[in-house]
Amino acid sequence: MAIPASRTQSEATVCIETALCTGCGQCVAVCKDFGLRLEGGKACLALHPLFGCVGCGHCMAVCPARAITVHGRGLGPEDLFALPPLSSSASFDAYYALLRRRRSVREFMPAEVEPELVERILDAARSAPTGVPPSDVNVLVLDSREKNRAFASDFCAHLKTLGWLTAPWFLWLMRPFWGKANDGLFRNFVRPALAAFTSSMDAGKNIVTYDAPLVMYFYGSPWADPADPLVAASLAMLAGEALGLGTCMIGSIHPLLQWGGSAARFRKRHGIRCKSREGVVVLFGYPGIHYNKGIERSFASVHRA
Protein backbone atom coordinates (compact mmCIF):
# COMPACT_ATOMS: atom_id res chain seq x y z
CA MET A 1 0.00 0.00 0.00
CA ALA A 2 1.24 3.50 -0.79
CA ILE A 3 -0.21 6.99 -0.55
CA PRO A 4 -0.72 8.08 -4.18
CA ALA A 5 0.66 11.30 -5.63
CA SER A 6 0.90 12.73 -9.13
CA ARG A 7 4.60 11.83 -9.25
CA THR A 8 4.41 8.31 -7.86
CA GLN A 9 2.01 5.54 -6.96
CA SER A 10 4.59 3.45 -5.10
CA GLU A 11 6.09 3.43 -1.63
CA ALA A 12 9.74 4.19 -1.03
CA THR A 13 12.30 1.57 -0.04
CA VAL A 14 14.29 1.79 3.19
CA CYS A 15 17.70 0.08 3.20
CA ILE A 16 19.56 -0.53 6.47
CA GLU A 17 23.28 -1.36 6.67
CA THR A 18 23.13 -3.49 9.80
CA ALA A 19 26.89 -3.47 10.24
CA LEU A 20 26.85 0.33 10.53
CA CYS A 21 23.78 0.59 12.77
CA THR A 22 24.56 1.55 16.39
CA GLY A 23 21.07 0.77 17.67
CA CYS A 24 20.49 4.32 18.91
CA GLY A 25 16.81 4.09 17.96
CA GLN A 26 16.48 7.62 16.62
CA CYS A 27 15.20 6.35 13.27
CA VAL A 28 12.49 4.36 15.04
CA ALA A 29 11.47 7.44 17.03
CA VAL A 30 11.08 9.74 14.01
CA CYS A 31 9.30 7.31 11.66
CA LYS A 32 5.61 8.18 11.85
CA ASP A 33 4.76 5.42 9.40
CA PHE A 34 5.90 3.12 12.24
CA GLY A 35 7.90 1.27 9.63
CA LEU A 36 11.04 0.67 11.73
CA ARG A 37 11.77 -1.20 14.95
CA LEU A 38 14.73 -2.31 17.04
CA GLU A 39 15.55 -5.99 17.15
CA GLY A 40 18.67 -7.39 18.77
CA GLY A 41 20.02 -3.88 19.23
CA LYS A 42 19.76 -3.06 15.52
CA ALA A 43 17.22 -1.15 13.43
CA CYS A 44 15.13 -3.23 11.05
CA LEU A 45 11.92 -2.93 9.06
CA ALA A 46 8.66 -3.32 10.95
CA LEU A 47 6.24 -5.97 9.77
CA HIS A 48 3.17 -3.76 9.60
CA PRO A 49 3.85 -0.11 8.71
CA LEU A 50 0.91 2.24 8.65
CA PHE A 51 0.97 3.21 4.95
CA GLY A 52 4.26 2.07 3.53
CA CYS A 53 7.23 4.43 3.41
CA VAL A 54 6.18 7.87 2.15
CA GLY A 55 9.76 8.97 1.53
CA CYS A 56 10.03 11.76 4.10
CA GLY A 57 13.69 10.85 4.67
CA HIS A 58 13.62 11.53 8.41
CA CYS A 59 15.23 8.20 9.29
CA MET A 60 18.04 8.81 6.80
CA ALA A 61 18.57 12.38 8.00
CA VAL A 62 18.66 11.53 11.71
CA CYS A 63 20.96 8.49 11.54
CA PRO A 64 24.37 9.43 13.01
CA ALA A 65 26.06 6.41 11.43
CA ARG A 66 24.78 6.82 7.86
CA ALA A 67 23.35 3.33 8.13
CA ILE A 68 20.02 4.13 6.44
CA THR A 69 19.23 5.13 2.88
CA VAL A 70 15.82 5.73 1.35
CA HIS A 71 15.08 5.31 -2.34
CA GLY A 72 11.91 6.20 -4.23
CA ARG A 73 9.08 8.74 -4.28
CA GLY A 74 11.53 11.28 -5.69
CA LEU A 75 14.02 10.79 -2.86
CA GLY A 76 17.50 9.30 -2.67
CA PRO A 77 20.62 9.54 -0.50
CA GLU A 78 21.99 12.18 -2.88
CA ASP A 79 19.32 14.54 -1.52
CA LEU A 80 20.94 14.71 1.91
CA PHE A 81 22.83 17.90 2.76
CA ALA A 82 24.61 19.25 5.82
CA LEU A 83 22.43 21.54 7.89
CA PRO A 84 23.57 25.18 8.02
CA PRO A 85 24.94 26.13 11.45
CA LEU A 86 22.38 27.45 13.89
CA SER A 87 24.39 30.66 14.15
CA SER A 88 23.55 31.43 10.51
CA SER A 89 19.80 31.28 11.12
CA ALA A 90 17.71 34.42 11.39
CA SER A 91 17.00 35.58 14.92
CA PHE A 92 13.38 36.03 15.89
CA ASP A 93 13.87 39.80 15.93
CA ALA A 94 15.22 39.76 12.36
CA TYR A 95 12.42 37.47 11.19
CA TYR A 96 9.76 39.56 12.91
CA ALA A 97 11.20 42.73 11.40
CA LEU A 98 10.85 41.16 7.95
CA LEU A 99 7.21 40.36 8.66
CA ARG A 100 6.51 43.81 10.07
CA ARG A 101 8.06 45.54 7.06
CA ARG A 102 6.09 43.47 4.55
CA ARG A 103 3.18 45.11 2.76
CA SER A 104 1.23 44.04 -0.29
CA VAL A 105 2.81 45.93 -3.19
CA ARG A 106 0.90 46.47 -6.44
CA GLU A 107 3.01 49.27 -7.91
CA PHE A 108 6.22 48.00 -9.49
CA MET A 109 9.25 49.48 -11.21
CA PRO A 110 9.65 48.30 -14.83
CA ALA A 111 13.00 46.63 -14.07
CA GLU A 112 13.01 42.86 -14.45
CA VAL A 113 13.72 40.54 -11.54
CA GLU A 114 17.14 39.02 -12.14
CA PRO A 115 17.13 35.29 -13.05
CA GLU A 116 19.34 34.45 -10.08
CA LEU A 117 16.77 35.98 -7.74
CA VAL A 118 14.01 33.97 -9.40
CA GLU A 119 15.96 30.79 -8.68
CA ARG A 120 16.61 31.80 -5.08
CA ILE A 121 12.89 32.38 -4.56
CA LEU A 122 12.11 28.96 -6.03
CA ASP A 123 14.81 27.36 -3.86
CA ALA A 124 13.22 28.86 -0.77
CA ALA A 125 9.74 27.74 -1.80
CA ARG A 126 10.94 24.18 -2.44
CA SER A 127 11.87 23.94 1.23
CA ALA A 128 8.19 24.18 2.22
CA PRO A 129 6.75 21.33 4.27
CA THR A 130 4.14 19.13 2.64
CA GLY A 131 1.22 17.13 3.96
CA VAL A 132 2.67 13.91 2.52
CA PRO A 133 5.81 13.76 0.36
CA PRO A 134 6.67 14.05 -2.42
CA SER A 135 5.46 17.59 -3.01
CA ASP A 136 2.57 17.84 -5.45
CA VAL A 137 3.05 21.60 -5.80
CA ASN A 138 3.37 22.94 -9.35
CA VAL A 139 4.65 26.42 -10.18
CA LEU A 140 3.97 28.48 -13.30
CA VAL A 141 6.62 31.20 -13.66
CA LEU A 142 5.99 34.32 -15.75
CA ASP A 143 9.30 36.16 -15.71
CA SER A 144 8.53 39.33 -17.65
CA ARG A 145 5.92 42.07 -17.76
CA GLU A 146 5.01 40.96 -21.28
CA LYS A 147 4.31 37.38 -20.20
CA ASN A 148 2.34 38.66 -17.24
CA ARG A 149 0.21 40.96 -19.40
CA ALA A 150 -0.49 38.17 -21.91
CA PHE A 151 -1.57 35.85 -19.08
CA ALA A 152 -3.79 38.48 -17.45
CA SER A 153 -5.32 39.53 -20.77
CA ASP A 154 -6.19 35.93 -21.60
CA PHE A 155 -7.60 35.50 -18.10
CA CYS A 156 -9.91 38.46 -18.65
CA ALA A 157 -11.03 36.97 -21.97
CA HIS A 158 -11.85 33.79 -20.05
CA LEU A 159 -13.80 35.81 -17.48
CA LYS A 160 -16.04 37.15 -20.22
CA THR A 161 -17.31 33.60 -20.77
CA LEU A 162 -18.44 33.45 -17.12
CA GLY A 163 -21.07 36.18 -17.14
CA TRP A 164 -23.67 33.72 -15.88
CA LEU A 165 -21.63 33.23 -12.67
CA THR A 166 -22.66 36.61 -11.30
CA ALA A 167 -25.95 37.05 -13.16
CA PRO A 168 -28.91 37.94 -10.89
CA TRP A 169 -30.82 34.81 -11.91
CA PHE A 170 -27.88 32.55 -11.01
CA LEU A 171 -27.28 34.21 -7.64
CA TRP A 172 -31.00 33.93 -6.86
CA LEU A 173 -30.98 30.26 -7.85
CA MET A 174 -27.90 29.39 -5.80
CA ARG A 175 -28.80 31.34 -2.65
CA PRO A 176 -30.58 28.41 -0.92
CA PHE A 177 -27.74 26.01 -1.76
CA TRP A 178 -24.58 27.90 -0.86
CA GLY A 179 -25.93 30.06 1.94
CA LYS A 180 -25.82 33.66 3.08
CA ALA A 181 -22.04 34.00 3.30
CA ASN A 182 -21.35 32.84 -0.26
CA ASP A 183 -24.27 34.87 -1.58
CA GLY A 184 -22.83 37.99 0.02
CA LEU A 185 -19.35 37.17 -1.28
CA PHE A 186 -20.55 36.82 -4.86
CA ARG A 187 -22.77 39.90 -4.79
CA ASN A 188 -20.38 42.22 -2.98
CA PHE A 189 -16.96 41.00 -4.15
CA VAL A 190 -16.96 38.55 -7.05
CA ARG A 191 -19.42 40.41 -9.27
CA PRO A 192 -17.82 43.88 -9.00
CA ALA A 193 -14.30 42.42 -9.12
CA LEU A 194 -14.87 40.50 -12.36
CA ALA A 195 -16.51 43.53 -13.94
CA ALA A 196 -13.58 45.72 -12.91
CA PHE A 197 -10.99 43.21 -14.15
CA THR A 198 -12.47 42.97 -17.63
CA SER A 199 -13.39 46.65 -18.10
CA SER A 200 -9.95 47.79 -16.93
CA MET A 201 -8.19 45.34 -19.24
CA ASP A 202 -10.34 46.56 -22.14
CA ALA A 203 -9.11 50.07 -21.28
CA GLY A 204 -5.49 48.89 -21.32
CA LYS A 205 -4.96 48.72 -17.56
CA ASN A 206 -4.08 45.49 -15.77
CA ILE A 207 -5.59 45.35 -12.27
CA VAL A 208 -5.47 41.55 -12.17
CA THR A 209 -1.71 41.09 -11.85
CA TYR A 210 -0.62 44.74 -12.08
CA ASP A 211 2.03 44.11 -14.76
CA ALA A 212 4.47 42.82 -12.15
CA PRO A 213 7.78 41.78 -13.75
CA LEU A 214 7.61 38.37 -12.06
CA VAL A 215 4.55 36.23 -11.37
CA MET A 216 4.48 32.78 -9.80
CA TYR A 217 1.31 30.71 -9.73
CA PHE A 218 1.45 27.96 -7.10
CA TYR A 219 -1.09 25.18 -7.43
CA GLY A 220 -1.45 21.55 -6.43
CA SER A 221 -2.86 18.41 -7.97
CA PRO A 222 -5.91 16.22 -7.31
CA TRP A 223 -3.72 14.30 -4.82
CA ALA A 224 -2.11 17.28 -3.08
CA ASP A 225 -2.78 18.42 0.45
CA PRO A 226 -4.78 21.62 -0.17
CA ALA A 227 -2.46 23.62 2.07
CA ASP A 228 0.75 22.69 0.24
CA PRO A 229 0.72 25.31 -2.56
CA LEU A 230 -0.30 28.02 -0.09
CA VAL A 231 2.57 27.21 2.26
CA ALA A 232 5.07 27.15 -0.62
CA ALA A 233 3.72 30.46 -1.92
CA SER A 234 4.07 32.01 1.54
CA LEU A 235 7.74 31.01 1.71
CA ALA A 236 8.28 32.39 -1.80
CA MET A 237 6.68 35.67 -0.79
CA LEU A 238 8.93 35.98 2.28
CA ALA A 239 11.98 35.09 0.18
CA GLY A 240 11.09 37.89 -2.21
CA GLU A 241 10.80 40.29 0.70
CA ALA A 242 14.20 39.19 2.03
CA LEU A 243 15.69 39.88 -1.42
CA GLY A 244 14.37 43.44 -1.44
CA LEU A 245 11.38 42.85 -3.70
CA GLY A 246 7.82 43.98 -3.25
CA THR A 247 5.31 41.14 -3.20
CA CYS A 248 1.57 40.58 -3.30
CA MET A 249 -0.60 37.49 -3.09
CA ILE A 250 -3.53 37.31 -5.52
CA GLY A 251 -6.24 34.80 -4.62
CA SER A 252 -8.88 35.70 -7.20
CA ILE A 253 -7.36 33.89 -10.19
CA HIS A 254 -7.11 30.27 -9.05
CA PRO A 255 -10.78 29.54 -8.23
CA LEU A 256 -11.87 30.70 -11.67
CA LEU A 257 -9.53 28.29 -13.48
CA GLN A 258 -10.94 25.06 -12.07
CA TRP A 259 -14.21 24.31 -13.81
CA GLY A 260 -15.65 24.34 -17.30
CA GLY A 261 -14.40 24.12 -20.85
CA SER A 262 -13.05 27.67 -21.04
CA ALA A 263 -10.98 27.10 -17.88
CA ALA A 264 -9.64 23.81 -19.26
CA ARG A 265 -8.58 25.50 -22.49
CA PHE A 266 -6.94 28.33 -20.53
CA ARG A 267 -4.98 25.83 -18.43
CA LYS A 268 -3.80 24.05 -21.55
CA ARG A 269 -2.69 27.28 -23.25
CA HIS A 270 -0.60 28.31 -20.25
CA GLY A 271 0.93 24.97 -19.32
CA ILE A 272 -1.09 24.55 -16.12
CA ARG A 273 -0.90 20.81 -15.59
CA CYS A 274 -4.10 20.09 -13.69
CA LYS A 275 -6.95 21.34 -11.57
CA SER A 276 -6.34 21.63 -7.84
CA ARG A 277 -8.35 22.46 -4.77
CA GLU A 278 -6.15 25.37 -3.71
CA GLY A 279 -3.72 27.69 -5.40
CA VAL A 280 -2.52 31.27 -5.30
CA VAL A 281 -0.61 33.75 -7.45
CA VAL A 282 2.30 35.75 -6.02
CA LEU A 283 3.54 38.96 -7.64
CA PHE A 284 7.17 40.09 -7.34
CA GLY A 285 9.06 43.18 -8.44
CA TYR A 286 11.05 46.16 -7.30
CA PRO A 287 8.52 48.38 -5.55
CA GLY A 288 7.49 51.62 -7.17
CA ILE A 289 6.17 52.99 -3.89
CA HIS A 290 7.72 52.73 -0.42
CA TYR A 291 5.59 52.86 2.71
CA ASN A 292 6.58 54.94 5.72
CA LYS A 293 4.35 53.21 8.26
CA GLY A 294 3.04 49.73 8.95
CA ILE A 295 -0.50 48.77 9.91
CA GLU A 296 -1.25 46.46 12.82
CA ARG A 297 -3.04 43.24 11.84
CA SER A 298 -5.27 41.01 13.91
CA PHE A 299 -6.93 37.61 13.88
CA ALA A 300 -10.70 37.18 13.97
CA SER A 301 -10.19 35.35 17.26
CA VAL A 302 -7.65 33.56 19.42
CA HIS A 303 -9.17 31.01 21.81
CA ARG A 304 -6.90 29.44 24.39
CA ALA A 305 -8.45 26.10 25.31
Q: What does each of the following model-derived ranges do?
A:
Residues 1-305:
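Acidic, surface-exposed loops and disordered segments
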